[in-house]
């Protein structure tokens, strides 16, 4: 609000998890038995993820001003975050004095092999991005690391002249390789760790894990391709 003395919240940073955070003991939670021995610890429990996403939805709706939204979900890791975020956005819309139209489209970006980011990004799907012209676009991503992948996607989308583009990412990694890109809305800022769970995968494994966890070396080797 113009003229307000209150400091604007930093939506692009989110809940900050420090580098020395030891995480939660796996024995305090339930998780799939087929992953026993493959994980170091729970970084973010499922309940905290859900609560944080609910707050993100409120922040997004307040910022966008109850305008119609075209949601562009980045698959595959972003689908769970996107589904839960959209559901919360719809709940807010149901209780508002104005209907907010929300349409969802999907795109896949391939930039990881094993636990390493590849040099080039592959864009799969989203052939008809011309439908984004004049729309308020919300890109929903699972993890922002270096920022190069998201910058490349934004550059591609901007060609279609949307009215507005906002980026919501569940996680933002602190890494020396970052080019400085920050999403408009972030769930959590985390250390530069390779995390799995809540639809985040390691070579297609761990998507069925509800919590966000840190994979150990045994798990990396077990599921390496």
UniProtKB/Swiss-Prot annotation:
Lineage of origin: Eukaryota, Metazoa, Chordata, Craniata, Vertebrata
Functional note: Has low, barely detectable phosphoribosyltransferase activity (in vitro). Binds GMP, IMP and alpha-D-5-phosphoribosyl 1-pyrophosphate (PRPP). Is not expected to contribute to purine metabolism or GMP salvage.
One record GO biological process: purine ribonucleoside salvage
Complexes and interactors: Homodimer.
Binding positions (GMP): 141-149, 173, 194-195, 201
The keyword Zinc is annotated on this UniProt entry: no
Keywords of this entry: Acetylation, Magnesium, Metal-binding, Nucleotide-binding
Short name of any one Pfam family annotated for the protein: Pribosyltran
Organism: Homo sapiens (Human)
Keyword Lyase belongs to the record: no
InterPro entries: HGPRT, Hxn_phspho_trans, PRibTrfase_dom, PRTase-like
The gene coding this protein: PRTFDC1
UniProt GO molecular function: magnesium ion binding; nucleotide binding; protein homodimerization activity
In-chain residues carrying the UniProt-annotated modification N-acetylalanine: 2
Any GO CC annotation of this UniProt entry: cytosol
UniProt cross-references to NCBIfam families, sorted A to Z: HGPRTase
Family: Belongs to the purine/pyrimidine phosphoribosyltransferase family.
Binding residue positions for Mg(2+): 141-142, 201
PANTHER family the record matches: HYPOXANTHINE-GUANINE PHOSPHORIBOSYLTRANSFERASE, PHOSPHORIBOSYLTRANSFERASE DOMAIN-CONTAINING PROTEIN 1
Organism superkingdom: Eukaryota
Protein known as: Phosphoribosyltransferase domain-containing protein 1
């Amino acid at each position: 609000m113009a003229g307000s003395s209150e400091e604007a919240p930093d939506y692009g940073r989110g809940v900050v998890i420090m580098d020395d955070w030891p995480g939660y003991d796996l024995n305090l939670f339930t998780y799939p038995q087929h992953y026993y021995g493959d994980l170091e610890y729970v970084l973010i429990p499922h309940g905290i993820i859900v609560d944080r996403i609910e707050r993100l939805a409120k922040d997004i709706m307040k910022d966008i001003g109850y305008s119609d939204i075209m949601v562009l979900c980045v698959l595959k890791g972003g689908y769970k975050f996107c589904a839960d975020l959209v559901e919360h956005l719809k709940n807010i819309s149901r209780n508002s004095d104005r209907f907010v139209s929300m349409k969802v489209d999907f795109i896949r970006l391939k930039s990881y092999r094993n636990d390493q980011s590849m040099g080039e990004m592959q864009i799969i799907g989203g052939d008809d991005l011309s439908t984004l012209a004049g729309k308020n676009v919300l890109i929903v991503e699972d993890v922002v690391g270096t920022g190069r992948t998201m910058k490349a996607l934004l550059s591609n989308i901007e060609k279609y002249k949307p009215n507005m583009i906002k980026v919501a990412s569940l996680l933002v990694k602190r890494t020396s390789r970052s080019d400085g890109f920050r999403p408009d809305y972030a769930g959590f800022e985390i250390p530069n760790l390779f995390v799995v769970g809540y639809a985040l995968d390691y070579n297609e494994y761990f998507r069925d894990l509800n919590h966000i966890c840190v994979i150990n070396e045994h798990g990396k080797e077990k599921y390496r391709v």
